[in-house]
Amino acid sequence: MHIHKIQAREILDSRGNPTIEADVTLTTGIIGRASVPSGASTGSREACELRDNDPKRYAGKGVQKAVKHVNNEINQALQGLSVEDQENLDRILCQLDNTENKSHLGANAILATSLACARARALSLNQPLYMTLNQGDMMTMPVPMMNILNGGAHADNNVDIQEFMIMPIGAPDFPVALQMGTEIFHVLKSVLKKQGLNTAVGDEGGFAPNIQSNRQALDLLSEAIEKAGFRLGEDIVFALDVAASELFNEGFYHMYSENQKFDSHQLIEYYANLISSYPIVSIEDGLDEKDWSGWKQLTTHLGNKVQLVGDDLFVTNPKILREGIAQGIANAILIKVNQIGTLSETRQAIKLAYDNGYRCVMSHRSGETEDTFIADLAVASGCGQIKTGSLCRTDRTAKYNQLLRINELASLPYAGKNILKR
């Protein structure tokens, strides 16, 4: 299981922007392949996504520099090494880059290589990827957080909150959960049409109409859930990704569609009112990534009622997560492999969260590819929750379809209402 060659190429992501794909060829001829996603709403402390900045190609968004790093330095450094030791490979990649944020080689170049090595190992063992990724955690089929109404940086509309998600916690298994979400998605389309609202979809496949308020979005979802024949609060609950860093300006949070602005305390009260009105069980990035005093207040006031997920706050970085744990900030972390740049560091963040009673939510990015690695990692890590968009666009459904295949192969329990236990 030794590496013969590593080769990368420039491909397109779901937004039509270049990204990187890497092939790791073993001496046996087996090829492991992985491609890297890209975010629109990004944390300031994410690992560096290396772009060419050449205005003559792809408006500066090309990734040929990252491709060359894989084909040259990375290929030379890893040739002859075994894919059996993922931590060693990732350590060498980080040492080769030798920067805090992977800005020399690019986190996109490093991650494509890291994930492709893991996939090559699974293929060489003739085992499913989720099996070879598992490190002894109790594996479960995750509850999907289905982003069926889009706003913020993920849509060209006037909605402030970035993601309105449904979670089918009442389903008996993953296939039924997917069915429930899909049926609600299609009913929602008819509800929007009936009210004369736009049914075009955003980056993650959710509908992106112009609506009057965040409450109206939740009311539309509630209507669709009931018309689809499901019980709100029992079969289906809500999750929000506020992406509050995108709303934060000069010390205030601006809800432009509602013509309101809030300080941290007022926004926490706003969330408390929403939680009392709707079955919201999770709020992601409820405050700005730098507003740690506000996050402390948020966690104190609402942390015993809902899951408070740090995305831009923690950027899948074990060092930053450790600081948050020490200060009692949030109670869950979003896991995005490209925020940190290697599989091993992603696993470290997951383990650190588990060891300190924090939950983990596996996540895609708004600029995705057909790669389904995160579906296997969600199952392997036993995180119990996954964000991978709405119920349309192949870049989103590819992950759901991979979870269906895993469910067919393995007799694993569906996380369901267990995610609500505290």
Curated annotation (Swiss-Prot):
Record SUPFAM superfamilies: Enolase C-terminal domain-like (SSF51604), Enolase N-terminal domain-like (SSF54826)
Cofactor notes: Binds a second Mg(2+) ion via substrate during catalysis.
Catalytic reaction equation(s): (2R)-2-phosphoglycerate = phosphoenolpyruvate + H2O
GO cellular component, one term: phosphopyruvate hydratase complex
Protein name: Enolase
Compartmental location: Cytoplasm; Secreted; Cell surface
Species annotation: Legionella pneumophila subsp. pneumophila (strain Philadelphia 1 / ATCC 33152 / DSM 7513)
HAMAP family, per the entry: Enolase
Example GO biological process: glycolytic process
Binding site for Mg(2+) 1: 41, 241, 284, 311
Cofactor(s) in the UniProt record: Mg(2+)
CDD domains per UniProt: enolase (cd03313)
Positions of Mg(2+) 2 binding: 41, 241, 284, 311
Pathway: Carbohydrate degradation; glycolysis; pyruvate from D-glyceraldehyde 3-phosphate: step 4/5
